[in-house]
Amino acid sequence: LPTYRDAAEKVREMFLANLALIGEIPAPTFEERSRAEMVAERFAAAGLQACVVDRLDNASALLPGTEGSSTLLLAAHADTLPAEDNKPDIEIHQDRVVGPFVGDNALALAALATLPVLLEQLNIRLKSNVVLLAASRSLGRGNLDGLRHFLAESGTPFQSALCLESFQLGRLNYAAMGMLRGEMTCRLPANYDWAQFGSTGTIIPMGDIISRISRIPVPQRPLTTIIMGTVQGGISPGNVARETTLGFEVRSESASHSEPGARATGGHCERCHCAIRASRSTWTSMPGANRVPSTSDIRWCARAGPFSADSV
């Protein structure tokens, strides 16, 4: 361990430089090109081979192994949520680093770009090839499209893979959860009676939907949860809301529980208010294989495609 710490201290300045260079480039989902080009540039500076940015803005590079009989994938998502400041500054202090999305996922990208230099400092040569990937279009409606595209187009069979997340650097998770993420939208119909006194608009029916979803029984084993993370609707306190949208996510260690959870949320949506059209769109994430304990669940999520269900 002392040897590793000494080597890490030698590349500390490079790591922080990579953090600032990469993290200060805005990269909201679907707009990662500039950040991807910077990551590819840092890969090249670290001596990696085949440093490229593909048409979906994935930045990848190859660290050749001494034998090269197998290939490992080391990936980190490159996109972020939209930022209020289009030019985020990262402040580096003696004991902390402060800035937008440093923890999601700039630290991991900096670690990815610095790893080849650290291995060189430690005089470690891996037998296997390692492909380093900064994946685009991972969050929200990105639906892991960047990773899916890379895996489909690379033509390389990967024996194993690791995903780097800034908040969990130093922690190894060997299991994965299936996920369904979606939206429910209540809209006023075209023939809505605006003259009706006491018109409720769409917020009250959405509140009924949220109440019903919160009462859906979910098991603790396998671990299952329904997260209702966002609600958006209305333009002012004095106007009836024409449209209200709920963003939710169903997570489970078992597809047999996450799929009924998604169906149950849609069912409550359809029963809440006959005058409101409710639409649901879902998208899935987490493709993968050979993962314990939920391999079949992850494959199921990867196969699932967007769908919608409407009712009046």
PLM regions with names:
Residues 1-4, 10, 24, 50, ...:
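Metal-dependent amide/peptide-bond hydrolase catalytic core
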Residues 33, 101-179:
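Acidic/histidine-rich catalytic neighborhood of metal-dependent amide-processing enzymes
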Residues 112, 164-189, 193-209:
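Phosphate/diphosphate-binding glycine-rich loops and adjacent basic-rich segments that engage nucleotide
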